[in-house]
């Protein structure tokens, strides 16, 4: 009850992000977040040495929780973004600033996230991408234990009760 209410991206909003992706390379980060379910800090702190492009996974080695230390699969849809960021420059981090430096959350949020949301007429926070991923996985029928593994959850039912926001159509079809 005290948790901040989070709203996942709708199918239409996800399509909007896909349409806008070619206008700025930093928009790809939104899609990387949606399709991996990682926290924004986990993606910004991801080092290239922990990314395996050929096998399509990466290791989260620094996380908010112990369960958060995990291997995350890279969806085929977003593999090209990982490849571009990986070979972009000499920065040890996968995602970097235009100057090739490590991205701080505030810098990304203020310089890119907020302007993108305004430009696309969408109102979301980075953590909503995590909720979106979990909802997409649940709607696709992925086993809850597998979802927990992917997103780094341990507790009973946390993923279902806190994160799953089924689209009304999916609920009507159930």
Sequence positions of predicted segments:
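Catalytic-site neighborhood detector that most strongly recognizes the C-terminal catalytic loop/helix
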Residues: 3, 8, 62-67, 151-174
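Structural motif
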Residues: 52-54
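Well-ordered beta-strand positions in beta-sheet-rich domains
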Residues: 57, 69-73, 160
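Basic, Lys/Arg- and aromatic-enriched nucleic-acid-binding interface segment
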Residues: 1-40, 44, 64-67, 88, ...
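Short, basic (Lys/Arg/His-rich) helix/loop patches that form interaction surfaces
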Residues: 15, 19-26, 36, 72, ...
